[in-house]
Amino acid sequence: GMVMAEAMGVDTSRSRMVIFVIAAMHAAAAGWLYAHLQRFVNPSPFGVHVGIEYLFMAVVGGAGQVWGAIAGAGVITILKQWLQDWLPKVFGASGNFETIIFGLMMVVILQRARDGLWPLLAKLVPARGTTRVIDASAEPLLRKAMPAAGEVILEAKNVTRRFGGLVANNDMNLHVEAGEILALIGPNGAGKSTMFNQLSGVDTPTSGEVLFRGKSIAGHGSREIAHLGMSRSFQHVRLLPKMSVLENVAIGAHLRGTKSVLPSAWRLDRVEEARILREAAFQIERVGLGEFMHAEAGSLALGQQRILEIARALASDPCLLLLDEPAAGLRLKEKQALGELMKKLRGEGMAILLVEHDMDFVMGLVDRVVVMEFGQKIAEGLPDEVQKNPRVLEAYLGGVE
């Protein structure tokens, strides 16, 4: 999830550091209270075995849930005490029987509830206000003006990428203009995804230059590039499957907020949260996933997850959208709806760079096509021109008679 979060403008290193500090503050406060309660402090209650037991409480309760650690602590503490009191009476002798029985019970619990007890209990109890409420009266997030039609948004100049002795991209040149859909196509192994990653900041060119609105971004991280106005989807879907569709899309709008991790952790950002959730809901409706807004992202079909990634990318309000095989796994009607959405975005002035294998989808949609083979550009032009190019036909069909 870190690659995805960085691509959406999240400073993952800083966020993890702040969360670690907050957790340390809570631990320090707990230690202070413990010392005053016991009137005496010694190292034994803070040994490795006790630390593992505390960690086990979180795992059993549900480490991904707010109330999971509390549930796990309650269950393990009560269960251990009950076994210590009950087993000697059953066996008629004292001993560490509870350790064996407790271990077996924990194995069963973790087999039956791999995500912890709290999610299992939540499924058994009717939901009461568990879904996030969309405040229609929340003030919309500010939107940036789109560039003028025809302005060069992204340009790659002589981009080369080497992995040891392998040249994945060799002297690649391309550009994308505002209000245009450009397709980057080629056979498997042509180097499209490598090029895509260099343009979006996930990877760095060995040589050459990448310009975004006239500014060099080669070597810049994907987080910095996202703040400039570029957003993307991924070839292999990158979602947070246990979070709702709404929450996943809200990640895309993160960079449009002003609050830091600390106010968010202590729930001091309610107004901004309402604005971000409203934006996320708008983008979900925009791509046709409104009925799944509060469903877990992992429960959606693969094609719907790809559409969800597009909604998340749009939530960041980009002027350039990079889509990596967005039509893969979609049915015909879903492809048609995606095509209409992309045409609408183009009409609004957005630039779109598309990597796709579905030639029927591409040729009826895009304005220009760049074709790659073995890491090099072999053709560029209008869709009709490219389809008749002998080098393109040879790359795809092995030559023509």
Regions found by a protein language model. Name each.
Residues 4-5, 75, 117:
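Hydrophobic/aromatic residues within transmembrane alpha-helices
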Residues 118-160, 400-401:
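ABC-family P-loop ATPase nucleotide-binding domain
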Residues 5, 9-10, 68:
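Glycine/proline-centered hinge or cleavage motifs at structural transition points of membrane proteins
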Residues 149-156, 160-401:
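Glycine-rich phosphate-binding loops of nucleotide-dependent enzymes
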Residues 16-105:
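Transmembrane alpha-helical segments in multi-pass inner-membrane proteins
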Residues 1-2, 64-66, 389:
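Short loop-to-helix capping motifs
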Residues 81-84, 115-119:
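Short helix-terminus and kink motifs of transmembrane alpha helices
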